[in-house]
Amino acid sequence: QISRVTDLPTIVDADTGFDSCAKTISTFEQKGLAGCHIEDQIAEKRCGHLDNKELIIKEEMVKKIKQSVESRKDKNFLIIVRTDANTVEGIDKTLDRIKAYEDAGADMIFPEAMKDEKEFEKVRKISKVFLLANMTEFGKSKLLNKTELENLGYNLVIYPVTTQRL
């Protein structure tokens, strides 16, 4: 409904892609959305800044990404891939997943719950695509401002709970 009342690009959270990434992408394109992000958690997902998350295996996520990319009809529709690996597997496995997700066709990477500037920087050093940062006031990431994230090479930042505090 948001995309019906604005000309601004609208990106939505597609959780784990629902039952079919192909159907999800097709539906979102038909509704006029600019993109979506899908994540590598199991279907019974949790907030990215909570503990006890479970991930699907990297190869399964790669298949979801390829399915999403192949089903996309509008080359400008952004396929953003979120990884929750940092708090589950650590930064090295996160970087490994990011490389695989980019190779599968992700347009933008959303590395969830990076602890500090060093981790954000490590992601930027290995990533070849656009990057999204999530700055939630009550999360695991150190709060960085737009300029700090821009200087770290991040292209988009979201503040998901800020408006709830106003």
Language-model features: locations:
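Alpha/beta enzyme core
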Residues: Q1-Y159, R165
